Protein backbone atom coordinates (compact mmCIF):
# COMPACT_ATOMS: atom_id res chain seq x y z
CA UNK A 1 0.00 0.00 0.00
CA UNK A 2 1.18 3.50 -0.74
CA UNK A 3 -1.31 5.45 1.39
CA UNK A 4 -0.56 6.32 4.99
CA UNK A 5 -1.93 8.70 7.63
CA UNK A 6 -5.45 7.92 6.38
CA UNK A 7 -8.14 10.03 8.07
CA UNK A 8 -11.89 10.24 7.54
CA UNK A 9 -13.10 13.49 6.01
CA UNK A 10 -14.91 15.41 8.74
CA UNK A 11 -17.53 18.15 8.29
CA UNK A 12 -17.89 17.49 4.58
CA UNK A 13 -21.16 19.43 4.34
CA UNK A 14 -19.58 22.49 5.92
CA UNK A 15 -16.83 22.37 3.32
CA UNK A 16 -19.24 21.82 0.44
CA UNK A 17 -21.41 24.70 1.69
CA UNK A 18 -18.46 27.08 1.39
CA UNK A 19 -18.13 26.38 -2.35
CA UNK A 20 -20.15 28.06 -5.08
CA UNK A 21 -20.85 26.42 -8.41
CA UNK A 22 -20.55 28.98 -11.19
CA UNK A 23 -20.97 29.30 -14.92
CA UNK A 24 -18.33 31.21 -16.86
CA UNK A 25 -16.78 31.81 -20.26
CA UNK A 26 -13.39 30.12 -20.66
CA UNK A 27 -11.16 32.36 -22.79
CA UNK A 28 -8.74 29.52 -23.63
CA UNK A 29 -11.31 26.99 -24.86
CA UNK A 30 -13.63 29.77 -26.08
CA UNK A 31 -16.63 28.06 -24.55
CA UNK A 32 -19.15 28.47 -21.77
CA UNK A 33 -18.46 26.13 -18.87
CA UNK A 34 -19.58 25.37 -15.35
CA UNK A 35 -17.37 24.60 -12.39
CA UNK A 36 -15.78 26.07 -9.31
CA UNK A 37 -13.27 28.89 -8.87
CA UNK A 38 -9.88 27.39 -7.96
CA UNK A 39 -8.95 30.29 -5.67
CA UNK A 40 -12.12 29.71 -3.64
CA UNK A 41 -11.62 25.94 -3.53
CA UNK A 42 -8.03 26.39 -2.35
CA UNK A 43 -9.29 28.11 0.81
CA UNK A 44 -11.53 25.15 1.67
CA UNK A 45 -9.84 22.02 0.24
CA UNK A 46 -6.36 22.94 -0.99
CA UNK A 47 -5.53 19.27 -1.64
CA UNK A 48 -7.55 19.30 -4.88
CA UNK A 49 -6.09 22.49 -6.35
CA UNK A 50 -3.24 22.49 -8.85
CA UNK A 51 -1.23 25.63 -8.17
CA UNK A 52 0.75 27.07 -11.05
CA UNK A 53 0.65 29.89 -13.57
CA UNK A 54 -2.98 28.90 -14.11
CA UNK A 55 -4.70 27.32 -11.14
CA UNK A 56 -6.83 24.26 -11.72
CA UNK A 57 -9.02 21.84 -9.82
CA UNK A 58 -8.69 18.06 -9.75
CA UNK A 59 -12.43 17.43 -9.81
CA UNK A 60 -12.02 13.66 -9.54
CA UNK A 61 -10.32 14.12 -6.18
CA UNK A 62 -13.44 15.88 -4.89
CA UNK A 63 -15.56 12.73 -5.15
CA UNK A 64 -14.57 11.55 -1.68
CA UNK A 65 -15.74 14.86 -0.19
CA UNK A 66 -19.08 14.53 -2.00
CA UNK A 67 -19.48 10.93 -0.82
CA UNK A 68 -18.97 11.96 2.80
CA UNK A 69 -21.34 14.90 2.31
CA UNK A 70 -24.06 12.55 1.05
CA UNK A 71 -23.51 10.27 4.03
CA UNK A 72 -23.85 13.25 6.39
CA UNK A 73 -27.10 14.26 4.66
CA UNK A 74 -28.44 10.71 4.96
CA UNK A 75 -27.78 10.76 8.71
CA UNK A 76 -29.66 14.05 9.02
CA UNK A 77 -32.59 12.68 6.99
CA UNK A 78 -32.74 9.53 9.10
CA UNK A 79 -32.74 11.67 12.25
CA UNK A 80 -35.67 13.71 10.94
CA UNK A 81 -37.56 10.53 10.00
CA UNK A 82 -37.10 9.21 13.54
CA UNK A 83 -38.52 12.43 15.00
CA UNK A 84 -41.68 12.07 12.90
CA UNK A 85 -42.45 8.44 13.79
Where are these regions (language model features)?
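C-terminal intramolecular chaperone/autoprocessing and neck/assembly modules of extracellular spikes
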Residues: 1-60, 76-84
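Extended amphipathic alpha-helical segments enriched in small hydrophobics
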Residues: 66-71, 76
Amino acid sequence: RIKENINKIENALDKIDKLDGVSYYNKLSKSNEIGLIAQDVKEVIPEVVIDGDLMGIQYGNMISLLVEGIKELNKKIEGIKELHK
